[in-house]
UniProtKB/Swiss-Prot annotation:
It comes from the Bacteria. Its EC number is 7.3.2.1. It is a peripheral membrane protein. Residues 18-261 form the ABC transporter domain. One of its GO terms (biological process) is phosphate ion transmembrane transport. It comes from Gloeobacter violaceus (strain ATCC 29082 / PCC 7421). The gene is pstB1. It is found in: Cell inner membrane. Its main location: membrane. SMART domains: AAA. It catalyses: phosphate(out) + ATP + H2O = ADP + 2 phosphate(in) + H(+). This is Phosphate import ATP-binding protein PstB 1.
Amino acid sequence: MVRNPMASAVESTLKTKAQTSNLSFYYGAIQALKNIHLTLAEHRVTALIGPSGCGKTTYLRCFNRMHDLYPGNRYEGQILLYPDEVNIVGPEVDPIEVRMRVSMVFQKPNPFPKSVYENVAYGLRVRGVRNRAELDEKVERALRQAALWEEVKDRLASLAFNLSGGQQQRLCIARALASEPEIILFDEPTSALDPLATLKIEELMGKLKQSITILIVTHNMQQAARISDFTAFMYLGEVIESGQTNQMFDHPTNQLTEQYVAGHFG
């Protein structure tokens, strides 16, 4: 298997935000990920591509320990989160603490059955923020970061379900941003949206990466090429090749990668 590791490129020019080493993951007795090695560059967008069932979402969900919600799942290896080099899949690390540092936005918008305001404030309240002025400030900041404030500032008390699909997804992004995470995980965040809403989300990611590291799963090769700085191609639970996005798409070193980005299978 030929690889083009991102580690050397990232270490020489950029800070590392997360380093995956020898990561394997098991659903019970079934091995879903096999010895994953991947570096996430700080304040950059990394895209995970590959055919359905290759392990992209499984890998993504390791970063915020979502697999811990189901008994029998287990991790081997490590994902070090910098700068403190905490192994966020280590059994000694509290998943709640991990999720405060690593937020996630899902494929379909999933706002809570609450007001626009309370959707964003909910996580802050869970973390112990009670002061109304502080809540107001943090909610507004998150909504502004998600490019949604001007559209909802006069209907913060309205149910989130009254927003359009694209607005709901940006609300979910604001909810993820409210806890001031270091990494945001996006699992095909625009697959259920129309082209205009998709464009807004993509533009938003370009702004967010100035202060946050982003890892995104996408089946859309054009989207990966547009928005990501680095790309990793996965197949059958392994990272086959990874590197700078333009190199991955224009000059892949692995035949499987070349066939996939050319659309010969998927």
